[in-house]
Amino acid sequence: MDSPGGVTDKKRISSERRKEKSRDAARCRRSKESEVFYELAHQLPLPHTVSAHLDKASIMRLTISYLRMRKLLDAGELETEANMEKELNCFYLKALDGFVMVLSEDGDMIYMSENVNKCMGLTQFDLTGHSVFDFTHPCDHEELREMLTHRNGPVKKGKEQNTERSFFLRMKCTLTSRGRTVNIKSATWKVLHCTGHIRVYDTCNNQTHCGYKKPPMTCLVLICEPIPHPSNIEVPLDSKTFLSRHSLDMKFSYCDERITELMGYEPEELLGRSIYEYYHALDSDHLTKTHHDMFTKGQVTTGQYRMLAKQGGYVWVETQATVIYNTKNSQPQCIVCVNYVLSGIVQKDLIFSLGQTECMLKPVESPEMKMTKIFSKDDWDDTNSLFEKLKQEPDALTVLAPAAGDTIISLDFSSNESDEQQCDEVPLYNDVMLPSSSEKLQNINIAMSPLPASETTKPLRSNADPALNREVVSKLEPNTETLELSFTMPQVQEQPTSPSDASTSQSSPEPSSPNDYCFDVDNDMANEFKLELVEKLFAIDTEAKNPFSTQETDLDLEMLAPYIPMDDDFQLRSFDQLSPLESSSSGSQNAATITILQQTQTPSTAADEIKPVAERVDDVKALIVPSSPVHVINDTSSAPASPYSGNRSRTASPIRAGKGTLEQTEKSCPGAPSLITVTLNKRSTAMDEELNPKMLALHNAQRKRKMEHDGSLFQAVGIGSLFQQTGDRGGNASLAWKRVKACKTNGHNGVEQKTIILLSTDIASKLLGQSMDESGLPQLTSYDCEVNAPIQGNRNLLQGEELLRALDQVN
């Protein structure tokens, strides 16, 4: 009898035998299956190198695809191919820019052409038999399913069912920009333009042996073309292709110049304009949908569409558009388009848009703009040529024609012989106009002080229409009695050599001719008088021709007349009440004030006249005062001056800022040389309220600029330079400069000296004063009170009661 242990061993041995037999049977079945799959793989139309390395799943997948393709091919009637056609079959795929793909109604890739490897990096056998949804972008699946659907609904008579398909599909790509292949997990998305048809195939023998009918086979045949990135285009573009860049709203930001030869447009006229303005109206809906796909998928191909030419008609164009993303934030930045022109201009004489008309592309100039261009030209010809120019612009003549109710001012071209002779004697300077005769020029001593380059001005001189200049002069010559305020400054006159000369020298406070109205123009005054309008109207000649020639035409006087607009005009007030200064010396002689005229360029003739005078001068120093209106350094208690007298007055202008004037008043002994005297009066408070606010603003601007750019007050006072006049009684008609003297009184002659340091703005302020007889406390700022307090012998500022007493004495 067997023990229980022996029974257990028998069962275990039998179980192991069964398992071993089972493993052997499975091994046998697998080997037989492998043989079958191996034989099946060799039946597939594949190279041996490919079929020998296929697994069972791949063999089954490829076999199913092959059977479907056979069914698809058997559905149609195959025609016998000629030998020539068979030889050309190998060139079809090379001619394609993409690859061929056949999809079943379920989305399985029945067939993929072998050139898919060059486009996507994936091999033909890796894709065939797989579902297309495994290799496409998830956002494109819905659109792809819609394209695979074949609607069998009723179709209207006369219309066939639309079987064409065109869409954009993002598919995995394992190719890099350098041509290398990466793993499928590192693949990127590439946009494919898929175009084709959906087909329904019925086999010839659609009935099986059982008698039921086979369903038709539906498939989608596509040609997939990848859209190249603009940065990867290596083939040079031909003459029928042009590049363009657009903003996100499809406005041109760049266009290739080849568009001019192809469509007639200039690249500059397209910038900033939308591309939709140049689309044919029938293609606008299709292009709108294409642009929507472009922003969704990154790249599109528009297909053939019509783009309007410039002069009329259209051309057929196909565009590849690519969205360029910012590398930092991955946001869309711009759109680059490669445009292929497929045809010439079609229907050139047909206008499809208003933009094709020349009047819309070329802006029309108004008559006012035409007249401005005509009168702003420098190359003025005679009156006949001007008439021809105006005759060519009939619309512009209406601008010059007077309207109803306008006053027609007649132009007086007559001239006086005395004025012509006087104009011939006036030397014209490039910067400063000196309207005086030769007799007056002998009595004027000009202190040359060149201006910096930033303050140079152009002369108010023109070779333009003289009639307009005369019109301005006639408006600037009102009756002298009606003037309320005039800029007058007495001129320096040499001491008369005879009593007859002294009797004939009389002071005339009013300007006698339009020459006296000429003045030097400051940079700040240019805005006041609107000189830019004068320059455009008179076509200013920047360089005077023969400025010192005494043979000038009779029209130079009118050219020198300034132009003052009516809205910027201000009334002039005469400055004829000049308070004389009493002199204690009976032997002192009459002295006139010196007029310092500043100009930018030193004339050669004037330089020749000053040279002999300068040779007799030992030393000449200019004193520049930057700040405070008036500084008086009084070494004595009082300094009486000689009575005031002058030859005549001329109209003066506001003096340039940045130039200081120094004038000295001292008591002269009998027999001593005559001294130059400058008399100034304090500005009355009541007059300040009546002054033009524009002139006050100009006065303050000049004072501020002088305080910023000039030297300090202490340096100016330390120089102590002063001008002194010496009379040459031997017949010399000109004034000579003498050595600059110190401010302190010399002990050996006992002459009391008083130095007055004045600014050009203060002179202009005093000229605006109502009368020299009136006196009042000037308006002082806080800065003036700190600097200009009376200085006593101890050289300390007054404080407290002493300051109050000093102010009471002034009042």
Curated annotation (Swiss-Prot):
Residues 634-652 have a biased composition (Polar residues). Residues 17-70 form the bHLH domain. Transmembrane segments: none annotated. In normoxia, is hydroxylated on Pro-402 and Pro-562. The hydroxylated prolines promote interaction with VHL, initiating rapid ubiquitination and subsequent proteasomal degradation. Under hypoxia, proline hydroxylation is impaired and ubiquitination is attenuated, resulting in stabilization. Pfam families: bHLH_HIF1A, HIF-1, HIF-1a_CTAD, PAS, PAS_3. The modification 4-hydroxyproline is found at residues 402, 562. Residues 529-573 are annotated as: NTAD. One of its GO terms (biological process) is positive regulation of DNA-templated transcription. Keywords: Activator, Cytoplasm, DNA-binding, Hydroxylation, Nucleus, Repeat, Transcription, Transcription regulation, Ubl conjugation. Residues 80-157, 228-298 form the PAS domain. Residues 576-785 are annotated as: ID. The modification (3S)-3-hydroxyasparagine is found at residue 788. This is Hypoxia-inducible factor 1-alpha. It comes from Gallus gallus (Chicken).
